[in-house]
Amino acid sequence: DTGLRRSELVRVEVAHIEGPDSDGAGRLFIPFSKTDQEGEGDYAFLSPATMSALKDWLSEGRLKTGPVFCQIKTHFDGSIAMICKNALHPNSVGEIYKRLVRTAHERGLLGQMGEVELERVVKSISSHSIRVGVAQDNFAAEESLGAIMQAYRWKDPRTVLRYGEKLAVRGGASARMAKRCAQLASGLTLCRRVD
């Protein structure tokens, strides 16, 4: 939901989560970020599904204050030994994403992906992959550049456009014109703006 940078993600504290509202959604206060050097803070949307997952995580970890995303000590077999009170280190975020992809593959959630392709995908994942992916998902859903920048706190449109350049064409002027023409396709009717 939030498209947080890794430095923002590891700083999320229980007190920063507001909600849920009557729809089950919430919002996250982001006190400081790369694009907010003055520390004025910003907010991000939290969906009902995210709010539910956060509620479960906080309950399971018995977290009432402090960092939401804490270090977890595990036994050799991978079972949880202890949920610590220390925040995750920013460098661990990318490794967690890689582990999630491997687990999804093991559970058959990535289709017929072979081991070679899996390793190529895992190697390409970084802590920034979520931000790139959220931009691409929004372009694929034909969200506007301005809406994407506002929702995920980007200041430079060139950055967002670079992440979604291949997908942005689907919502561009040419694509919109083609849709209008297809809707008006009857004989020699000229394509024109339809509101």
Across the structure, where does each feature detected by a protein language model lie?
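Mobile genetic element proteins and their domesticated derivatives, centered on retroelements
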Residues: 3, 9, 30, 69, ...
